[in-house]
Amino acid sequence: MNASDLIRIMQFGDSVLPVGAFTFSNGVESAIQTGIVHDVATLKGFVLTALKQAASCDGMGVVVAHRAVVADDRDGIIRADWAVNNRKLNEESRLMATRMGKKLAEMSIHVVEHPLISWWLEQIKNGNTAGTYPVTQAVVMAAQGIGQREVVVMHQYGVAMTILSAAMRLMRVTHFDTQHILFELNHDIEKFCDIAEIGDINQMSSYVPIVDVLAAVHVKAHVRLFSN
């Protein structure tokens, strides 16, 4: 990998990329409020579950969309996007995916200036597609020539960091703890990337009941710091 590709991966995979990720907790807020997550060990377990679920749903969407971009199959990109959106059972998950996806597309047309990204944002604005974050990420990175494996890794990193960053504001956990968790999950992320690279829409699954239960709890929570 050359330096140019690496720095683009670092830029678009940065946890402070201005796409609104800081407003979401990926479900960990409710998990902490209900006591499911209460220490470093349970936080690590929650992140691991989220990464596995992301690999079998959003991660596969990333791969399918990336392959469609490479094949210049624009209908295939849209099919992948709706497949991701339709598998998000709770409203908060759909809101997170579509809000961040649109923000990424809006930012990227000013940074990358690629016709495919302009087309993609137009489809989102016209309601022709949902504009989920995983598929938008695939479109933006594939347009820059970044490989599918690297984009899946970016997505996995984003899932983990969204949860860990939120956890630091919600529970007694240190920077050292969260970085250690992320480091320890490296080998698991490698396996989850293999799952995502199956790249088959028909095998995409978002079945993690606890996530949807926590989302329902979060909707009715009296105090909320995050949007999900």
Swiss-Prot record:
The gene is ureF. Belongs to the UreF family. Pfam families: UreF. GO terms for cellular component: cytoplasm. It is found in: Cytoplasm. UreD, UreF and UreG form a complex that acts as a GTP-hydrolysis-dependent molecular chaperone, activating the urease apoprotein by helping to assemble the nickel containing metallocenter of UreC. The UreE protein probably delivers the nickel. Required for maturation of urease via the functional incorporation of the urease nickel metallocenter. The keyword Chaperone applies. GO terms for molecular function: nickel cation binding. The keyword Coiled coil does not apply. This is Urease accessory protein UreF. Keywords: Chaperone, Cytoplasm, Nickel insertion. It comes from the Bacteria. Its main location: cytoplasm.
